Amino acid sequence: MAQNGSVEQFLDVAVEAAKKAGEIIREGFYKTKHVEHKGMVDLVTETDKACEDFIFNHLKQRFPSHKFIGEETTAACGNFELTDEPTWIVDPLDGTTNFVHGFPFVCVSIGLTIEKKPTVGVVYNPIIDELFTGIDGKGAFLNGKPIKVSSQSELVKALLATEAGTNRDKLVVDATTGRINSLLFKVRSLRMCGSCALNLCGVACGRLDLFYELEFGGPWDVAGGAVIVKEAGGFVFDPSGSEFDLTARRVAATNAHLKDAFIKALNE
């Protein structure tokens, strides 16, 4: 067993942290925001920082020997190292641009890796009060009720989600729009909702059939959602079709029926 408790205890403490951080997000959602730029279109607010500080303090009090990786602390120091030690990977506010604009697709994402494997996942949208949870080998849940990926088996009837990203280099944008243009002829429709973690949870609960994203911020965007998708019966993998790498900033997710066709479509 991992240090300082069982996986169920880890989940309980992560849920506590996510819900309390959610209160901070909910309070800030309806107020004037003080926004900083991390890049041309990549934003950060005082709420991001306050939530990360709270979550890390909450987790460190309970699990002082564990390791911690967070979006805002990594942005400040510029690097991170994922080891075999139990490691909490946190995005305190996934969907910051949505938060700034008052678009209610925002969440806290908390993932725990043990021996580099995503093991516990918590994704909480405090604006609409949806809590997604998962433990490796023990199922996935939305507000305590079991969830499963969709049973859709036809790509042409599938709902796809992706994101445009924050890189505005012309070659990158052209590649992004070219890929989207190709996929639009193969699926029913496309959504860009602005949160990698919630897109993964959308696949997990069957609202979305397909999701992929390239060059997102880091492992904090996917560490929680990846567990939840897998425990809902889905597959998480690299868009090339190779094995998912938590640190590679590339992800795709779908159900068993669509996986092969989705990989083919992504690489045509």
Curated annotation (Swiss-Prot):
Keywords: Hydrolase, Lithium, Magnesium, Metal-binding. Mg(2+) 1 binds at E71, D91, L93. GO terms for biological process: inositol biosynthetic process; inositol metabolic process; phosphatidylinositol phosphate biosynthetic process; signal transduction. Its EC number is 3.1.3.25. The keyword Magnesium applies. It holds the Pfam family Inositol_P. It is an enzyme of class 3 (hydrolase). It comes from the Eukaryota. The keyword Hydrolase applies. GO terms for molecular function: inositol monophosphate 1-phosphatase activity; inositol monophosphate phosphatase activity; magnesium ion binding. Pathway: Polyol metabolism; myo-inositol biosynthesis; myo-inositol from D-glucose 6-phosphate: step 2/2. Substrate binds at E71, L93, D94, G95, T96, G194, S195, C196, E213, D221. Induction: Up-regulated by light and down-regulated by Li(+). It catalyses: a myo-inositol phosphate + H2O = myo-inositol + phosphate. Expressed in the shoot apex, roots, stems, leaves, flowers and young and mature green fruits. Mg(2+) 2 binds at D91, D94, D221. Its cofactor is Mg(2+). Belongs to the inositol monophosphatase superfamily. Responsible for the provision of inositol required for synthesis of phosphatidylinositol and polyphosphoinositides. This is Inositol monophosphatase 3. The lineage of its organism: Eukaryota, Viridiplantae, Streptophyta, Embryophyta, Tracheophyta. The gene is IMP3.
